[in-house]
């Protein structure tokens, strides 16, 4: 939110129930901080294959620092540094990026890497893989490319019923950012259709996605309206919006920022009573703060926390090694970016702070 932008408080909201956990997950934290390190370590431009995370404000913040987002690695000039997004990339994309000769950082979420590994192992053992995922979503596209001849993407029960009669064993895997509701019915239909289906010992569904959905379900029945903060191309954000509607909340609004809240003709926020607020896993906390300021609840804000999240994903190894080398050179008086600090600070500094420091 720009400092010069003033959001008119409403005075008509009684109170806000603020879901927790909300906002950045561990994978998004890692990816944003990794790209921040690259911006600080390299002379621009730094390139990024796809949006680093699915959030308009985050992408705009990096674009302001000269990061160039591309949807084809062929658009990256040879020798330029490039980051691959948190959603995971097809093996041929990783190979092409590497062959272009620049420094390549793969910021894929470790939970997505787990699914890629499962696909590779099951395909190698001769399984047909039923993969529950959204058509065209970058995570699904990258995962399916790991073993395109073995994997069959489905999104609903009808697509499960339309699958062929496999002669080989069947495995069931999923896009990590699905809602449990999206996954459960399709998984049940797959198990009914293929009773001997193999499933991983630990669910493919992201714990952060599940936590945010559970936190929303804790507050939604008590709310007159729910505001979900996040971008329309964020799968987990859209799932939160749909979940709030399924919970029976009549007024559900997905907004990129406070400026998009519904307004009365006089410009005031057109919400009343108790308003629930949550944010998708790619939405920075500054957007939440701006929405709370705009709602200005007379009875204050009550944070409803269902669990704590302390998971930490460190930067990719080659980036850690680069930053360590820069630190050592700087300590010897041999140059290097003065703003770069030791990687031991990475865990302590939240992505929102790292992102804000770029401004």
Tell where the protein language model's regions lie, with residue ranges.
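The feature marks the mature, well-folded catalytic cores of soluble enzymes
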Residues: 2-279, 285-359
